């Protein structure tokens, strides 16, 4: 009987004995590894000496002669890698799937910033340079190796915008801060008589009502009465009002009734003082708690008129005015405008002095009471040399600008300058008293003279 070694020697040998032996060893090793629990598959060798001469033809790997093993994925990758290295060494580039070449990006045009924008452009360029590494990294990490394209467009100020900004700056057309208007009623919140909740509505109504039933230019319709006679009557009314110690509202309403009646009815010269006395009686009954007696009015007229004359003229005036004597006078606006000016007692006395001087001026009889009151405040500001002369608060509450008041205020300042030499100086002597601060003795405003 032949032994095991003799049978092995007598068996026919394969053509490639080395390959068969190697295959048997690999199979035995794989079987042994599969039999061991927890065993891992052996990694492919990094270098296989017997495939150094592998070739790639039409994207397929051609094994050397004598190698018949199946080509796995990892084994094929190793063969391809080795073949590419050999081809590169021989200056022959082997590419498995040649990709489509993309045209190289054109270099970006260089933008030269203007001198005034050099700092901004340099700052923006520095920011873009800092962003370049991150953008290249993002392109490298994209799937498929495709580079991401970022469109970076620099913001450059156009020539038109630059010229427009320069023109506005040269012409002074810039955004000016809003004018600050002071809340003049903030201290009267707890005063119910101040009616802070609807004080603005009240004065808006006054501004509308002052345009109704205004005296007109009546001197052309008067035959025996002229502006000088009216000024004499107004000066006498101021004197009587001061001696009777009546309310200020009574004085301004008296002059309104006189002017309104003269606008509607021609009056004889001898009856002009009678009209003034009857108008004061009407205003006193409307404004005062205790109106003067008719006998007292007869006395101040030096008994020129009887009781029947005064009462008859009173009735005639009321009928001619249709009993409409509820009108805004300059006094109601003076109170509001003095408060807006934030004036002290000296400014208040000076304003009332100019307003009483305005009562003697016939040219101001037909003007709006708000305009006369605002002009008196402006003239007082100029006389006392207050700064600023006209604030945004005064402009808001009066509704007039400084230029709108200048002409009317100039008339008042001229009357103040002529008062010491005038025969009609009742208001001048009244406000020269120590009780009223002697404001009439102040020198007239030079800026309006």
Curated annotation (Swiss-Prot):
One of its GO terms (biological process) is G1/S transition of mitotic cell cycle. Gene3D superfamilies: Cyclin-like. Residues 1-37, 98-147 are annotated as: Disordered. GO terms for cellular component: cyclin-dependent protein kinase holoenzyme complex; cytoplasm; nucleus. Residues 8-37, 136-147 have a biased composition (Low complexity). One of its GO terms (molecular function) is cyclin-dependent protein serine/threonine kinase regulator activity. It comes from the Eukaryota. PROSITE patterns: CYCLINS. InterPro entries: Cyclin, Cyclin-like_dom, Cyclin-like_sf, Cyclin_A/B-like, Cyclin_C-dom, Cyclin_N, Cyclins_cyclin-box. Keywords: Cell cycle, Cell division, Cyclin. Pfam families: Cyclin_C (PF02984), Cyclin_N (PF00134). Belongs to the cyclin family. Cyclin AB subfamily. This is Cyclin-B1-5. It comes from Oryza sativa subsp. japonica. The lineage of its organism: Eukaryota, Viridiplantae, Streptophyta, Embryophyta, Tracheophyta.
């Amino acid at each position: 009987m032949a032994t095991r070694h003799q049978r092995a020697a007598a068996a026919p040998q394969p053509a490639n004995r080395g390959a068969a032996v190697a295959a048997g060893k690999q199979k035995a090793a794989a079987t042994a590894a599969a039999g061991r629990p927890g065993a891992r598959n052996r990694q492919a060798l990094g270098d296989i000496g017997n495939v150094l001469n592998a070739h790639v033809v039409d994207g397929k790997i051609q094994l050397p002669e004598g190698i018949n093993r199946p080509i796995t994925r990892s084994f094929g990758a190793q063969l391809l890698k080795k073949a590419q290295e050999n081809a590169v060494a021989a200056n022959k580039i082997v590419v498995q799937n040649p990709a489509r070449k993309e045209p190289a990006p054109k270099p970006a045009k260089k933008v030269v910033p203007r001198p005034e924008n050099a700092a901004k452009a340099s700052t923006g360029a520095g920011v873009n340079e800092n962003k370049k590494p991150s953008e290249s990294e993002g392109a490298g990490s994209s799937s498929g190796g495709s580079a991401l394209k970022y469109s970076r467009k620099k913001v450059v100020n156009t020539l038109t915008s630059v010229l427009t900004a320069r023109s506005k700056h040269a012409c002074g057309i810039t955004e000016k801060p809003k004018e600050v208007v002071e809340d003049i009623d903030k201290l009267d919140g707890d005063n119910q008589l101040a009616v802070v909740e609807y004080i603005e509505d009240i004065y808006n109504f006054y501004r509308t009502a002052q345009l109704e039933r205004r005296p007109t230019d009546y001197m052309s319709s008067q035959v025996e009465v002229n502006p000088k006679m009216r000024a004499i009557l107004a000066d006498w009314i101021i004197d009587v009002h001061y001696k009777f110690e009546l309310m200020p509202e009574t004085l301004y309403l008296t002059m309104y009734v006189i002017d309104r009646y003269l606008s509607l009815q021609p009056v004889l010269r001898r009856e002009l003082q009678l009209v003034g006395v009857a108008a004061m009686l009407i205003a006193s009954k409307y404004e005062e708690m205790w109106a003067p007696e008719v006998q007292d009015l007869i006395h101040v007229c030096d008994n020129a008129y009887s009781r029947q004359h005064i009462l008859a003229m009173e009735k005639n005036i009321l009928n001619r005015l249709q009993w409409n004597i509820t009108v805004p006078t300059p006094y109601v606006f003076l109170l509001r405008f003095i408060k807006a000016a934030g004036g002290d007692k000296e400014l208040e006395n000076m304003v009332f002095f100019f307003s009483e001087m305005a009562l003697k001026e016939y040219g101001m009889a037909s003007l709006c009471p708000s305009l006369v009151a605002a002009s008196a405040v402006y003239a007082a500001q100029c006389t006392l040399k207050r700064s600023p002369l006209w604030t945004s608060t005064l402009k808001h509450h009066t509704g007039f600008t400084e230029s709108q008041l200048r002409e009317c205020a100039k008339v008042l300042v001229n009357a103040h300058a002529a008062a010491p030499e005038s025969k009609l100086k009742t208001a001048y002597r009244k406000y020269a008293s120590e009780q009223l601060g002697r404001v009439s003795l102040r020198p007239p405003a030079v800026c309006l003279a």
